[in-house]
Curated annotation (Swiss-Prot):
Disulfide pattern: none
InterPro entries for this protein: GPCR_Rhodpsn, GPCR_Rhodpsn_7TM, Olfact_rcpt
UniProt KW keywords: Cell membrane, G-protein coupled receptor, Glycoprotein, Membrane, Olfaction, Receptor, Sensory transduction, Transducer, Transmembrane, Transmembrane helix
The keyword Cell membrane belongs to this UniProt entry's keyword annotation: yes
Transmembrane feature ranges: 29-49, 57-77, 98-118, 144-164, 197-217, 237-257, 272-292
Protein source organism: Mus musculus (Mouse)
Record's bilayer topology term: Multi-pass membrane protein
Highest taxon, organism lineage: Eukaryota
GO BP of this protein: G protein-coupled receptor signaling pathway; sensory perception of smell
Name of the protein: Olfactory receptor 8G17
Length: 306
């Protein structure tokens, strides 16, 4: 056999969510609607923050960065998935598949660390309010966001680099609605021990470190809030964190369920369902969560409309 995966497979076919013909149109309309809401919600949030001087704070700088990640993540995945609902075969070239995988990993990992950075920002704001401006300087915020993307790129480079060392000859049908890493590896006829090891290591790192950052930040936040004597003060402090906690819970539960399961016992159908949450649903929900439960965003939106 010739070496190099492009010598055996030049293109793949995505199986999509379901093969049932009666569900294709309803699912197409459903996910098209979700994608449009995602684009409008996240771009709207970015524009609102850019145009409202009232929101030019570190908290909303991170929120605009999260919205950008969600917009990109959804755009990387959803349009190609929609093709399957209107065409019998959803073909994707090998380079296009690897590119989709690369950007998917970049934005998925970046979102994980961005949520951690946002938790750290809330910790500083509530636990050290007098030092907040000096600690969360513009340089510090830019460095954190840059670090988030660097971590995403490093992780994606490791996975894509490992993909290039294996051959594909079992099948050209990816049992997923996008070029998911585990689904691609299931088509390999090479030894994928190294790939599985890299997945396990990076999954643990990208789950444990952000989770520890978030949990430790909120542990200190809760302690600080409990020291606040006034009920109004406690309520205000909790309200600034509730939206972030909701976003964190949805993202980590769905992502962890997918990638911390051993591949040998992993059900691809279950994987598709959990993947829908963090690749399609979460990017749509985040701007809704942060706008509906955030007084500052509501005020800025009201001022812009008026």
């Amino acid at each position: 056999m010739e070496k190099g995966n492009q010598s055996t497979v030049n293109k793949f076919f995505l199986s999509g969510l379901t093969e049932q013909p009666e569900l294709q149109l309803p699912l197409f309309l459903l996910f098209l609607g979700i994608y449009l809401l995602t684009v409008l919600g996240n771009l709207g949030m970015i524009i609102l923050i850019l145009l409202s001087s009232y929101l030019h704070t570190p908290m909303y700088f991170f929120l605009s960065s999260l919205s950008f990640i969600d917009f990109c993540q959804s755009t990387v995945i959803t349009p190609k998935m929609l093709v399957k609902f209107v065409r019998e075969k959803n073909e994707i070239s090998y380079p296009e598949c690897i590119t989709q995988l690369c950007f998917f990993v970049i934005f998925a990992v970046s979102e994980s660390y961005m949520l951690a950075a946002m938790a750290y920002d809330r910790y500083v704001a509530i636990c050290s309010p007098l030092l907040y401006s000096s600690i969360m300087s513009q340089h510090k915020c830019l460095s954190l966001v840059l670090g988030v993307y660097i971590l995403g790129i490093v992780c994606a480079s490791a996975h894509v680099g490992c993909i290039f060392r294996i051959d594909f000859c079992k099948s050209d049908l990816i049992n997923h609605y996008f070029c998911d890493l585990i689904s691609i590896l299931n088509l390999s006829c090479s030894n994928i021990f190294v790939n599985d090891l890299v997945i396990l290591i990076f999954s643990l790192i990208n789950t444990i470190f952000p989770t520890l950052t978030i949990l430790s930040s909120y542990a200190f936040i809760i302690i600080s809030i409990l020291r606040i004597k006034s009920t109004e003060g406690r309520s205000k402090a909790f309200s600034t964190c509730s939206s972030h906690i909701s976003a964190v819970a949805i993202f980590y539960i769905s992502a962890g369920f997918t990638y911390l399961n051993p591949s040998s016992s992993h059900s691809m159908d279950e994987g598709k369902v959990s993947s829908i949450f963090y690749t399609i649903i979460v990017p749509m929900l985040n701007p809704l969560i942060y706008s509906l439960r955030n007084k500052d965003v509501k005020i800025a939106l009201k001022k812009m409309i008026e």
